[in-house]
């Protein structure tokens, strides 16, 4: 798991475009470029094949509200990489990095996430990573720098979504969770499968140095 460099911003952009599952905001390429410049764009790489298997983005609201808001989204994993808990792990890393490591966080910044009705995949990952539900939210065109028309049902003008906000008091638990993953699980995720046990080793040390997880 790594931060996406400015020169690499199209890698997660084209990955999401290629999967085209219709459950995510259709963010323009420049949103990924801006996130990469701000060190708020992440991707997961299979180092054996050198192929991208997952993405995540923290996108600024772009307006001048007294309370800053950022949208945590773009959470997409290749179907073959699902079921390992990688999405949950990525969101934890994103939030710990954003708040503890990036140097860009401000105490009044709100980190929001929205999940479209019927898309249950990200719910567990968000809850595991310290987000709490804030109820139904209607997202209108222009609320975020992204195209949402493909998510609007016939005859309506909004997208019905479930809203979540990050609980800043959860950051200590997330740091502890990542420390245990590195020091007790040795960065290994194991899953039993009818074809045999599968072990996945995850390294995110270039995003959060292990020494920064010391408790």
Please annotate each region the language model reported.
Residues 77, 83-100, 124, 128:
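Conserved acetyl-CoA-binding loop-helix of GNAT-fold acetyltransferases
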Residues 66-79, 114:
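Conserved acetyl-CoA binding element of GNAT-fold acetyltransferases
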Residues 139-214:
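C-terminal "cap" of GNAT-fold acetyltransferases
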Residues 103-104, 117-136:
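Conserved active-site alpha-helix within GNAT-family acetyltransferase domains
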Residues 49-55, 70:
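Glycine-rich phosphate/pyrophosphate-binding loop shared by adenosine-nucleotide-utilizing enzymes
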Residues 1-14, 171:
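A short beta-loop-alpha structural element at the N-terminal edge
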Residues 19-48, 57:
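Active-site rim helix/loop that mediates acceptor-substrate recognition in acyltransferases
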Residues 109-123, 140-144:
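Conserved beta-strand-loop-alpha-helix junction that forms the acyl-donor binding cleft
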């Amino acid at each position: 798991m790594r931060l996406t460099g400015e020169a690499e911003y199209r890698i997660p952009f084209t990955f999401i475009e290629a999967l085209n599952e219709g459950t995510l905001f259709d963010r323009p390429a420049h949103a990924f470029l801006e996130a990469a410049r701000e060190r708020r764009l992440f991707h997961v790489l299979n180092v054996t094949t050198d192929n991208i298997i997952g993405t995540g983005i923290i996108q600024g609201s772009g307006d001048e509200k007294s309370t800053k808001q950022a949208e945590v989204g773009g959470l997409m994993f290749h179907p073959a990489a699902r079921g390992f808990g990688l999405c949950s792990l990525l969101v934890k890393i994103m939030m710990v990095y954003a708040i503890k490591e990036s140097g860009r966080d401000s105490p009044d910044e709100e980190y929001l996430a929205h999940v479209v009705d019927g898309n249950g995949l990200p719910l567990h990952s968000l809850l595991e990573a310290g987000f709490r539900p804030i109820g139904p939210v209607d997202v209108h065109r222009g609320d975020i720098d992204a195209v949402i028309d493909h998510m609007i049902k016939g005859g309506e003008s909004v997208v019905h979504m479930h809203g979540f906000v990050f609980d800043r008091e959860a950051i200590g638990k997330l740091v502890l969770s990542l420390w245990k993953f590195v020091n007790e699980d040795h960065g290994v995720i194991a899953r039993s499968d009818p074809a045999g046990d599968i072990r996945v080793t995850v390294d995110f040390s270039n995003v959060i140095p292990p020494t920064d997880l010391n408790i």
